[in-house]
Amino acid sequence: MQAYRSWLAQERGLAFDADYQALWHWSVTELDAFWQSIWDYFELQSPTPHTAVLADDRMPGAVWFPGAQVNYARQVLRHADAAHAAGQPALVSHNEQSLAEGRAAAEMSWPELRRQVAALALHLQDQGVGRGDRVAAYLPNVPAAVVALLATASLGAVWSVCAPDMGTDAVLDRFRQIEPKVLIACNGVVYACLLYTSDAADDSLR
C-alpha cells in the first residue's frame, strides 16, 4: 500500500501519506482516476487499448476497460525471466507431511512453472478447450492447481475449482451449473497424516 501511495504522489501528484480514509474516499468517488491508476501501477498489458475505464456503471452489468484484452496468465508469466534472474522462486509450498517432519518448503522455479503451464495448455487445446470454455478442477491447494489455473487462463477459458474435502453432492451441484468441457482431478488427499483416496468421488463425478 505504501508503495502505491508513493507512486500516486510521484506519478499523479496525489499525496495521501498515511491517510487511508482519504485514499479510500478517492478510490470510491473518482472511479475512472483510481482504476486507471491501478492499471498503470501494475503495468497491465493489452494487445488492444481500452477506450474508457468504466463505460457503464450499472450494477450488475458494469463494463470495465472496454476494448482491452487482459490475460491473467500472461500478466503473471511476463515476470518469469526477471524473477528467475533475481533468484526468486515462482511457487513455495508445504504439504502436511513436510510440515510434520520439519522439512524445508518445496520450490518451483519460474522456467519450470512456465514449462508445465505450456504443456498443460497444449493438452487442454488438444481436448478442444478454447476461449469461454469451462475447466473444472477437483484439487487441493497444491502447485498443480496453480499450473492448471494458469494453463486454463492462458487459453481464455474459465477456471472453477472445488477442494476434495467438499462433499461430492456439493461439488456436483457447482460443476453441473457451468457444464465444464474438461475435469482435472486428484486421486487422493492427505489429511491428519492419513491418505484418503477419491475413488468414490471420482465415480460420482464421472
Name each model-derived stretch.
Residues 1-49:
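N-terminal amphipathic, basic-rich helices that act as targeting or association modules
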Residues 22-26, 73, 87-150, 167-172:
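Conserved AMP-binding/adenylate-forming core of the ANL superfamily
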Residues 28, 36-50, 67-92:
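A short N-terminal helical cap/helix-turn-helix that marks the beginning
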Residues 139-140, 160-176, 188-195:
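ATP-dependent adenylate-forming carboxylate-activation enzymes
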Residues 148-153, 202:
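Short hydrophobic alpha-helical segments of the AMP-binding
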Residues 156:
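Structured binding elements
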Residues 179-180:
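Proline-aspartate-enriched helix->loop->beta-strand connector
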Residues 196-201:
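Conserved small/polar residues in nucleotide/adenosyl-binding loops
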